[in-house]
Amino acid sequence: MKARTRAATVLLTPFFLLFTAVMVVPIGYAVWLSLFTEKQSGLGFGGTETVFTGLDNYTAALGDRAFREGFGVLLGYCLLYIPLLLGGALGLALLLDSALARARRFFQLALFLPHAVPGIIAALIWVYLYTPQLSPVVQAMEAGGIGFDFFSPEGALPSVVNIALWEWLGYNMVIFYAALQAIDRSVLEAATVDGAGAWRIAFSVKVPLVKASLAMVALFTIIGSLQLFTEPLILNKGTGSAVTSTWTPNMYAYTAAFDRNDYGLAAAASVLLALTAALLSFAVTRMTGRRKAGKGRTA
């Protein structure tokens, strides 16, 4: 027993050290930093000094309309992006898994390739495609009588959602496709023998069997959505877009830290965003756990 305990300690120690170094320490430092503010001493003529201000930075962030509106943008983004991503990725995976699909490897690679493009490059590509003077897509739309300003207040959110979908649709499709490939083929054969058609098998057999993967992807997508930063940042730089420097909470924190040098406020905004992500993650995992427990009791 002691030998097992020693072996477990030896194996787990590197993990806990790494976890502490890359997770616990940065979060702890952000919390500590959020409790302080740099102020000018000597009636503004002296140097700066770090002053303990308690929860003042949190109050300032929550009281700032721009920060609150950033959460509103995130809510709209999540409501538009998450259903499209999950539905699109699952639909493509089901299509590739069907008997009708041909050239699966080619389409897997073609759909996954956008994920290999760095986020900044992807955003720059789409900024080019959104710019009327440069984009053949916009020019073709205008020639067809379809006028849409991708940089307008109404078009900014769909523009960002489109970039994110282009980046992540293929990646999540691969996850769903792997889960579908792991389904016991005898289950599908039995459903076919019972007279189930392709649609019935897809939505009554396959989808319920990949719900665990669906829940995992949904959780990671929610967390990733809260971290929205790169795509709107690129749209904010010199495009004339309605995306402002505080469009999302992450951009608000970035602006506070590097444009206004208010690291305490930036840390407070980051901690509030992290708490939101933690609460949503807890809620999703709790709901998933309850559904599994309910099914277990029913069985």
Annotate the PLM regions.
Residues 4-299:
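A structural signal for multi-pass alpha-helical bundles of membrane permease subunits
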